[in-house]
């Protein structure tokens, strides 16, 4: 947990930002409960907003539900990944795009709708990144992006490499010597060696060494307009609006869920669920399905209960009591999503029930921040998930050419690839390089 001198650093940093006296600044920080977060980006932003003194529409501290709703709220997407030599896997998203912290759009949107300013910074090397992080942490808490799988409290569904470099955000509260104090979703803060933190931050490509701080004093919109805009964005996304273009766009929104339903009940004759995931792969796919709905920092029920809390707050802000009825509907919908997740690994099939219990044990240990339990469970996964890869020729190892030379030959698109620009997706082309790049792009959860 955070040591006394670390807490004093936070108090003095708040004094410098707000002009408060020591007792007032300390009281404000001490009042902040050791809350258990639900969603990493929402929880991290709530922490930064509290430290910056940014209030919600009612004058109190913004809730995590309010941040989720203002950031864009709900969404939906379904993807099946099949490659020769690899076990097929399934992914379902239930929040607005992108559900994971591939960029800062969700955080920036929510903060600006609350009238806060976001200051983003990146670095070109680990040494420069550490200097920038230390300088920012000296003034207050900092949000940073890193690879979730590198953290000692990250739960495991299967082998570490199965998740790839899953982007994640934490709040760095203090740096003492060679140890950083991090706040994630557990009630207590974690202390992590700076070398581990640097490795986790360097693992990402587009978000490499990215940090973000929040400050008060932005152009605060009318809270009612902000809430209306946020709800409209959520409605559009559920309707299928997507930044993704091409054939993959049909997998988003309610149309994407309809395609999944057709695959499950066999109406999709081309690729029914039982053909994509035969008995040898069924446990693997069903375990991932439950993980994405219940355990992937959704708060359970695919974010629907948390969004219902936002709708209750929106009803008060907009003075529209009818939204409370919609909130009740979303709580019922969340219960239905949880029921679907439970049906994926039911009690009456003993091996599936064992997988579900193992998932819950790991998840509970991670939520408690019980590192001892996490160490015992590290890299352990259930025999039912040890599925043989799908038959087929193993992917050919592609020949590589120097990235900088490729970028020079590729013009603007090559430069975009070289620097990990947003929106790049490898094109299909004859030869192994493009196919292998596309395979790596899709095998990591979107």
What is the predicted function of each stretch?
Residues 291-446:
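Charged, long alpha-helical assembly modules
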């Amino acid at each position: 947990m955070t040591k006394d001198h670390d807490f004093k650093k936070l108090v003095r940093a708040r004094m410098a930002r707000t002009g408060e006296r020591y007792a007032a600044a300390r009281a404000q920080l001490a009042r902040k409960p050791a809350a258990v977060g639900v969603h990493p980006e929402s929880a991290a932003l709530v922490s930064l907003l509290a430290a910056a003194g940014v209030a919600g529409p009612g004058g109190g501290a913004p809730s995590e539900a309010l941040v989720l709703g203002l950031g864009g709220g709900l969404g939906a997407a379904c993807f099946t990944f099949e490659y020769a030599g690899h076990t097929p896997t399934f992914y379902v998203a239930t929040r607005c795009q992108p559900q994971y912290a591939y960029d800062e759009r969700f955080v920036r949107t929510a903060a600006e709708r609350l009238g806060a300013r976001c200051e983003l910074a990146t670095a070109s090397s680990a040494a420069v990144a550490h200097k920038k992080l230390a300088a920012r942490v000296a003034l207050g808490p900092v949000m940073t992006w890193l690879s979730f799988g590198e953290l000692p409290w990250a739960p495991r569904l299967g082998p570490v490499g199965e998740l790839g470099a899953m982007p994640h955000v934490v709040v760095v509260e203090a740096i003492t010597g060679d140890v950083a104090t991090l706040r994630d979703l557990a009630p207590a803060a974690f202390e992590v060696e700076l070398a581990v933190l640097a490795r986790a931050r360097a693992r990402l490509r587009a978000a490499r060494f990215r940090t973000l701080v929040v400050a008060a004093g932005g152009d605060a919109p009318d809270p009612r307009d902000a809430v209306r805009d946020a709800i409209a964005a959520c409605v559009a996304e559920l309707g299928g609006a997507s930044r993704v273009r091409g054939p993959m766009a049909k997998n988003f929104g309610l149309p994407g869920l309809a395609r999944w339903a057709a695959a499950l009940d066999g109406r999709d004759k081309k690729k029914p669920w039982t053909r994509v995931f035969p008995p040898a792969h069924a446990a693997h796919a069903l375990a991932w399905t439950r993980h994405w709905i219940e355990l992937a920092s959704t708060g359970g029920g695919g974010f629907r209960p948390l969004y219902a809390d936002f709708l209750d707050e929106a009803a008060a802000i907009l003075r529209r009591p009818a939204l409370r009825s919609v909130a009740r509907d979303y709580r019922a919908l969340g219960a239905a999503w949880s029921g679907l997740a439970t049906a994926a690994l039911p009690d009456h099939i003993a091996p599936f029930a064992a997988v579900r219990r193992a998932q819950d044990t790991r998840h509970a240990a991670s939520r408690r921040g019980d590192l001892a339990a996490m160490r015992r469970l590290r890299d352990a996964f259930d025999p039912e998930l040890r599925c043989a890869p799908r038959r087929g020729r193993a992917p050919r190892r592609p020949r590589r050419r120097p990235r900088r030379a490729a970028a020079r030959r590729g013009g603007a698109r090559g430069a975009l690839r070289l620097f990990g620009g947003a929106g790049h997706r490898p094109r299909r082309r004859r030869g192994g390089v493009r196919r292998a790049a596309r395979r790596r792009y899709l095998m990591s959860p979107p």
